[in-house]
């Protein structure tokens, strides 16, 4: 259940974040690639002082149920999620997350209360959180309880505040749902919908590459979720198979928003210590701290190839240098002609890299040639120059998806793709339909179900 907590999600030293609704005018963006995406972000020095709100990892007087006092400043968003900043007696601002419990009798279990959930089993442990499978005493549903340990000296982990603040405002079938937030003196608990596995575990269970139809449905759902958050100017920043949850019916859900960032916030540079090395784009590996949604799209390309080929696209074994060499071996060593501006990146030293020519992707990953249009889509996602990468919205319109039912593009945000007739997963190699049980939606091939 790595997707619920993310072992590498500890906050970077000295890291600050800005939360809230964009206070800027957004221009129309290209739907073909990531070029021009950064133009919608105002530099920090152009934002009036009274519009700047900073959250730091400080000792917290965190109480999600306290009514706002007069000294509380509110940062609103269009979806009514908000983060409050209450000025303490020391003059520092400490983060507060507000939520409202539904009315109930004094003796019945309530949302927002620790005794409303029963822990069933431990699922895993990260650097600052432990995840349990649990059950709600309010409605009887299974949940995942992400229990974050609060350190008296450090206060509430910043990544937890970021994750909660973003997820409370995201409602989409392909994004893990945050049901509840519980705060006690010792812990902060995020209560998520329970999803039984992740893409990493799913691929480990089915080595050698997944069924092509299933790859297509998983990728479509990943792009749906990303398109939704990117349209809201949010970057995930930590895409990897462990952070993509898979339900027993085949629904894919983006999870672990601990490193996610609202890109509409007035900040041009972000930490480059994000994204597991295998899924980290070359611009970030080379020290770039100015990036946008194209950061996530590189990860999509890596995951796409891995689902088809059955092995990681760029499995670096040593360090950043080794990771870059593996990328350049396939895509070619960049220069100013193929990647304008690459020489200005902090860690790009041409003499350090072997000079490789680019090759067709099927030479590196032969199974791409077995699937119509897969190589073309992968090549448009795995572009060294970030501005050349396809956007999530454009990728959804790629010919690779042309044999899917048109109604998939008409679904509302909260509607699952499996509500469309004949859209269902296929048994993976060596599995029978019986192995999945009666609740799973396996059936005839997608190639025969366009409508």
UniProtKB/Swiss-Prot annotation:
Membrane topology: Peripheral membrane protein
GO cellular component, one term: nucleus
Active site (UniProt): 238
Enzyme class: transferase
One GO molecular-function entry: cyclin binding
Subcellular location: Cell membrane; Cytoplasm; Nucleus
Region entry Disordered, spans: 84-114
UniProt KW Ribosomal protein keyword: no
Enzyme nomenclature, EC number: 2.7.11.22
Keyword set includes Membrane: yes
Reaction it catalyzes: L-seryl-[protein] + ATP = O-phospho-L-seryl-[protein] + ADP + H(+); L-threonyl-[protein] + ATP = O-phospho-L-threonyl-[protein] + ADP + H(+)
Keywords: ATP-binding, Cell cycle, Cell division, Cell membrane, Cytoplasm, Kinase, Membrane, Nucleotide-binding, Nucleus, Phosphoprotein, Serine/threonine-protein kinase, Transferase, Wnt signaling pathway
Database matches in CDD domains: STKc_PFTAIRE1
A Gene Ontology BP annotation from the UniProt entry: Wnt signaling pathway
Post-translational modification Phosphoserine, affected residues: 60, 77, 116
Residue ranges of domain Protein kinase in the record: 117-401
Known regulation of activity: Serine/threonine-protein kinase activity is promoted by associated cyclins CCDN3 and CCNY and repressed by CDKN1A.
Domain of life of the source: Eukaryota
Sequence positions that bind ATP: 123-131, 146
PANTHER family: CELL DIVISION PROTEIN KINASE, CYCLIN-DEPENDENT KINASE 14
Function noted in UniProt: Serine/threonine-protein kinase involved in the control of the eukaryotic cell cycle, whose activity is controlled by an associated cyclin. Acts as a cell-cycle regulator of Wnt signaling pathway during G2/M phase by mediating the phosphorylation of LRP6 at 'Ser-1490', leading to the activation of the Wnt signaling pathway. Acts as a regulator of cell cycle progression and cell proliferation via its interaction with CCDN3. Phosphorylates RB1 in vitro, however the relevance of such result remains to be confirmed in vivo.
Homology family: Belongs to the protein kinase superfamily. CMGC Ser/Thr protein kinase family. CDC2/CDKX subfamily.
Assembly behavior: Found in a complex with LRP6, CCNY and CAPRIN2 during G2/M stage; CAPRIN2 functions as a scaffold for the complex by binding to CCNY via its N terminus and to CDK14 via its C terminus. Interacts with CCNY; CCNY mediates its recruitment to the plasma membrane and promotes phosphorylation of LRP6. Interacts with CCDN3 and CDKN1A. Interacts with SEPT8. Interacts with 14-3-3 proteina YWHAB, YWHAE, YWHAH and YWHAQ.
Name the UniProt record assigns to this protein: Cyclin-dependent kinase 14
Higher taxonomy: Eukaryota, Metazoa, Chordata, Craniata, Vertebrata
């Amino acid at each position: 259940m790595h997707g619920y907590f993310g072992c590498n999600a500890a906050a970077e030293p000295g890291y600050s974040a800005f939360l809230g609704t964009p206070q800027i005018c957004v221009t129309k963006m290209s739907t073909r690639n990531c070029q021009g995406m950064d133009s919608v972000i105002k530099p920090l020095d152009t934002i009036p002082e009274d519009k700047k709100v900073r959250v730091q990892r400080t000792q917290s007087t965190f109480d999600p149920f306290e009514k706002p006092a007069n000294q509380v400043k509110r940062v609103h968003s269009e979806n009514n999620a908000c983060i409050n900043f209450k000025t303490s007696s020391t003059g520092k601002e400490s983060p507060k997350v507000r939520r409202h419990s539904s009315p109930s009798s004094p003796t019945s279990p309530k949302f927002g209360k620790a005794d409303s959930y029963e822990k069933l089993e431990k699922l895993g442990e990260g650097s600052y959180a432990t995840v349990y499978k649990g059950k709600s005493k309010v409605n009887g549903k299974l949940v995942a309880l992400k229990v974050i340990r609060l350190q008296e000296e450090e206060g509430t982990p910043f990544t937890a505040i970021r994750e909660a603040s973003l997820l409370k405002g995201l409602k989409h079938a392909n994004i893990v749902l945050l049901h509840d937030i519980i705060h006690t003196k010792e812990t902060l608990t995020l209560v998520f919908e329970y999803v039984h596995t992740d893409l990493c575990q799913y691929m480990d269970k089915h080595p050698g590459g997944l069924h092509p139809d299933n790859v297509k449905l998983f990728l479509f759902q990943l792009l749906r979720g990303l398109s939704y958050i990117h349209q809201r100017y949010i970057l995930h920043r930590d895409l990897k198979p462990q952070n993509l949850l898979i339900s027993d019916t085949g629904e894919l859900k983006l999870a672990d928003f601990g490193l996610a960032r609202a890109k509409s916030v007035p900040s041009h540079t972000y930490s480059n210590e994000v994204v597991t090395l295998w899924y980290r784009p070359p611009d970030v590996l080379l020290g770039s701290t100015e990036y946008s949604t194209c950061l996530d799209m590189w990860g999509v390309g890596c995951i796409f190839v891995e689902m088809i080929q059955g092995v990681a696209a760029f499995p670096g074994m040593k360090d950043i240098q080794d990771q870059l060499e593996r990328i350049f071996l396939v895509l070619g060593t960049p220069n100013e002609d193929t990647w304008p501006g690459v020489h200005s990146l902090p860690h790009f030293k041409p003499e350090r890299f072997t000079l490789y020519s680019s090759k067709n992707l099927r030479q590196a990953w032969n199974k791409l040639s077995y699937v119509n249009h897969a190589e073309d889509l992968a090549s448009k996602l795995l572009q060294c120059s970030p501005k050349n990468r396809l956007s999530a919205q454009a990728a959804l319109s790629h010919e690779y998806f042309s044999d899917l039912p048109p109604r998939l593009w008409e679904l509302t945000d909260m509607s699952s793709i499996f509500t469309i007739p004949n859209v269902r997963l296929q048994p993976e190699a060596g599995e029978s339909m019986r192995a999945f049980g009666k609740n799973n939606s396996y059936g005839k091939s997608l190639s025969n179900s366009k409508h």
